[in-house]
């Protein structure tokens, strides 16, 4: 039997089954207990953080094969991987391949951002059924696809219908672009890259055509009613995130952020879980401000950022430009990092791009956990360092974030098994590796005794005499 089947059986049909609902009534759910063990934290702390809104456990009651996880400042920094088909590329099997690779290389959640080229319901259902990690979606994509791309035919009910369909299928969190208001649109004037959010762009077009307020904002309470029946979490979308350094931290971005804070509180009144999405493209000196501002405006709801990229001049290497910003954002308190692949701004990622992007972001998240002094975060680093000093090559590979890549690079020049016991690699060769110089603690203790008995002046004189 699938693990969560018995957990959720008694909840089905209730008006509110969210983790926040139970936490606020001091009920520790099976999901909270599972997360507590995973994070090595007390169950009571998990319950308190979920109740407070500083942590979410995205766990739709219809996603039965899910292994619950937590997103929040009290837990380890998480990484999301985006996959999804486009009208020009990919199919269901390709997306499942990307999913399996993402999970293999440590994705904590996966978003299906399919926009076309496949049956969207088919690919989403296949991904959810195959995924042990939470699945997120952006429902406005399918809402537009359902009316064949015709903004003028897209109604408020179309949005709500698709949102509930995703909940029924088992989606654990949905990006809802409810913070973009019609009065925010003029603030985009003067930007270099305008609106770069696909979902935000769709809603901006809808508002410009209909001259009405954002339907996801006006119907927000209706969406909350849907979400709490399935325990689907909000990922409040940042439609006005900056798409370049020039636009970072501008009036448009901050106006939307203020609205996202208000929506966070509205969702919490329904006991619905919320995280808030963030930029984007941000210079390094503005990253701390962006994280602190989100925490202030959104009352410490978990922050989920895309990057941010710290420079705009490296197409093909944006997994690197963004991992730099992601590590900093994680250090300052961001709860989840959305990966960027080398294909960002250039094309649809293939499976190898997924691997490259994910490893870059696992590095960033791990570095953030170390910088935040999270308990045990550095244990694996220390263990690998001991293996490195002992020339235990197989142990080094095993402890690596990407064992296959580490082994592959080592074996390019020294492939034979005998070199797995060698006290060198091809960088220094057999005679020049500094780690071969095994200076023991006993050696250093003896040196300390000599230094203390002779004194600095005598040691320096001895050195000069030797040089002469």
UniProtKB/Swiss-Prot annotation:
Q: Does the keyword tRNA-binding apply?
A: no
Alphabetically ordered keywords of this record: 4Fe-4S, Iron, Iron-sulfur, Lyase, Metal-binding, S-adenosyl-L-methionine, Thiamine biosynthesis, Zinc
Q: Read off the Gene3D superfamilies from this record.
A: 6.10.250.620, Radical SAM ThiC family, central domain
Please name the pathway. Answer: Cofactor biosynthesis; thiamine diphosphate biosynthesis
Under Enzyme Commission nomenclature, its number is 4.1.99.17
Sequence positions that bind [4Fe-4S] cluster: 425, 428, 433
- Keyword Oxidoreductase listed: no
Which coenzymes or cofactors are required?
[4Fe-4S] cluster
Q: Where does Zn(2+) bind?
A: 281, 345
Q: What single Pfam family name could you report for this chain, choosing any that match? A: ThiC_Rad_SAM
Q: Which InterPro entries does the UniProt record give?
A: ThiC, ThiC/Bza_core_dom, ThiC/BzaA/B
> What domain of life is recorded for the organism?
Bacteria
Catalysed reaction(s) here are: 5-amino-1-(5-phospho-beta-D-ribosyl)imidazole + S-adenosyl-L-methionine = 4-amino-2-methyl-5-(phosphooxymethyl)pyrimidine + CO + 5'-deoxyadenosine + formate + L-methionine + 3 H(+)
Q: Which GO terms describe its molecular function?
A: 4 iron, 4 sulfur cluster binding; carbon-carbon lyase activity; zinc ion binding
Top EC class, one word? lyase
Tell me which family the UniProt entry assigns to this protein. Answer: Belongs to the ThiC family.
Instruction: State the protein's purpose.
Output: Catalyzes the synthesis of the hydroxymethylpyrimidine phosphate (HMP-P) moiety of thiamine from aminoimidazole ribotide (AIR) in a radical S-adenosyl-L-methionine (SAM)-dependent reaction.
What is the name listed in the Swiss-Prot or TrEMBL entry for this protein? Phosphomethylpyrimidine synthase
Species assigned in the record? Prochlorococcus marinus (strain SARG / CCMP1375 / SS120)
């Amino acid at each position: 039997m699938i693990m969560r089947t018995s957990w959720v059986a008694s909840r089905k049909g209730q008006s509110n089954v969210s983790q926040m609902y139970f936490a606020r009534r001091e009920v520790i759910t099976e999901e909270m207990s599972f997360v507590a063990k995973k994070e090595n934290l007390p169950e009571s702390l998990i319950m308190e953080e979920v109740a407070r809104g500083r942590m979410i456990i995205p766990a739709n009651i219809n996603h039965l094969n899910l292994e619950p996880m937590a997103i929040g400042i009290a837990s380890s920094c998480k990484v999301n991987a985006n996959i999804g088909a486009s009208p020009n590329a990919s199919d269901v099997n390709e997306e499942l391949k990307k999913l399996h690779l993402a999970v293999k290389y440590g994705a904590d959640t996966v978003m299906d951002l399919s926009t076309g080229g496949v049956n969207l319901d088919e690919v989403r259902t296949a991904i959810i059924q195959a995924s042990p990690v939470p699945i997120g979606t952006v429902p406005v994509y399918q809402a537009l696809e359902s009316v064949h791309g015709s903004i003028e035919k897209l109604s408020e009910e179309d949005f709500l219908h698709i949102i509930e369909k995703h909940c029924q299928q088992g989606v654990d969190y949905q990006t809802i672009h409810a913070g973009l208001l019609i009065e925010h649109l003029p603030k985009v004037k003067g930007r270099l890259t305008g609106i770069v959010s696909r979902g935000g762009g769709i809603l901006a077009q809808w508002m410009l055509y209909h001259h009405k307020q954002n339907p996801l904002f006006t119907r927000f309470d209706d969406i909350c009613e849907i979400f709490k029946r399935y325990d689907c979490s909000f990922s409040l979308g940042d439609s006005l995130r900056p798409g370049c350094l020039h636009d970072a931290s501008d009036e448009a971005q901050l106006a939307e952020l203020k609205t996202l804070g208000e929506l966070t509180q509205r969702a919490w009144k329904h006991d619905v879980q919320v995280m808030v999405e963030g930029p984007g493209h941000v210079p390094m000196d503005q990253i701390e401000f962006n994280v602190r501002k989100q925490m202030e405006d959104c009352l410490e709801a978990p922050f989920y950022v895309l990057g941010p990229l710290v420079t705009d001049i490296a197409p093909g290497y944006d997994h690197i430009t963004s991992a730099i910003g992601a590590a900093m954002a994680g250090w300052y308190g961001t709860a989840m990092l959305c990966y960027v692949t080398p294909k960002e701004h250039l094309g649809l990622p293939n499976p190898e791009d997924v691997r490259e992007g994910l490893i870059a972001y696992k590095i960033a998240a791990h570095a953030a956990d170390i910088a935040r002094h999270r308990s045990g975060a550095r244990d694996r680093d220390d263990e690998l360092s001991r293996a490195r000093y002992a020339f235990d090559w197989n142990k080094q590979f095993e402890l690596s974030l990407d064992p296959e890549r580490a082994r592959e690079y080592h074996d390019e020049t020294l492939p034979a098994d005998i070199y797995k016991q060698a006290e060198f690699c091809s960088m220094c060769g057999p005679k020049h590796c500094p780690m071969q110089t095994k200076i023991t603690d006993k050696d250093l203790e003896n040196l300390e005794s000599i230094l203390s008995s002779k004194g600095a002046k005598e040691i320096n004189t001895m050195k000069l005499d030797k040089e002469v």
